[in-house]
């Protein structure tokens, strides 16, 4: 009888340990991210190297002005672009926001992205990279990432698109390394036929070729 009781006690302990081990395995890889937006930016810059593309830090006025974010809802932020933005559309905006503001922030970044895309389509400048933009929402972290090395502008659209996709995949890999998953929420609007999305009117009222901003 004692041997039977001892056997069942031992079996119970083994099952308990196995259950605990299973819970530990379930939690493995689910480390909570506590990085600031700047720390995430620094990680992207380090891991991507030449595929990062940004060399200028943006100001808070840019975050609240151009992107329209409510800074009262932002816990930390980081934003960078390329100093030659007329021909290099590399851009990275990362924010850690307060609870409940992530989707609003994502919508604002989407709106700003559409203006960048409109410019890129109008001049056919760095277009394939812009079309490979990433909009990530992971908990309270939101990011718009237009990153990648410059491709060969003289190459065919197909070759440029393939190169841009490969560069964007590098961004996915780094983001996945931080958050464990990637889910690109960017929306690519269709071209409206005007070639400029209403962002610029390239002729003045008299039909001259002098560019006029704002219509």
Regions found by a protein language model. Give the residues of each.
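C-terminal motif of bacterial Sec signal peptides marking the signal peptidase cleavage site
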Residues: 15-19
């Amino acid at each position: 009888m004692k041997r039977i009781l001892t056997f069942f006690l031992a079996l119970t302990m083994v099952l308990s340990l196995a259950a605990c081990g299973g819970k530990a395995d379930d939690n493995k890889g689910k480390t909570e991210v506590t990085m600031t937006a700047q720390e995430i930016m620094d990680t992207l810059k380090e891991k991507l190297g030449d595929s990062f593309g940004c060399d200028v830090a943006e100001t808070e006025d840019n975050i609240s002005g151009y992107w329209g974010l409510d800074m009262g809802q932002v816990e930390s932020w980081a934003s960078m672009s390329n100093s030659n933005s007329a021909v290099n559309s590399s851009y990275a905006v990362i924010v850690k926001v307060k609870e409940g503001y992530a989707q609003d922030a994502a919508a604002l970044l989407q709106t700003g992205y559409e203006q960048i895309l409109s410019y890129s389509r109008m001049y056919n400048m760095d277009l394939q990279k812009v079309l490979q933009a990433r909009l990530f929402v992971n908990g309270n972290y939101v990011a718009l990432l237009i990153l990648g090395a410059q491709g060969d502008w003289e190459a065919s659209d197909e070759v440029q698109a393939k190169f841009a996709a490969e560069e964007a995949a590098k961004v996915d890999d780094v983001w996945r390394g931080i958050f464990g998953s990637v889910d690109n929420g960017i929306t690519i609007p269709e071209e409206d036929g005007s070639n400029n999305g209403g962002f610029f009117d390239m002729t003045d009222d008299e039909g001259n070729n002098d560019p006029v901003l704002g219509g």
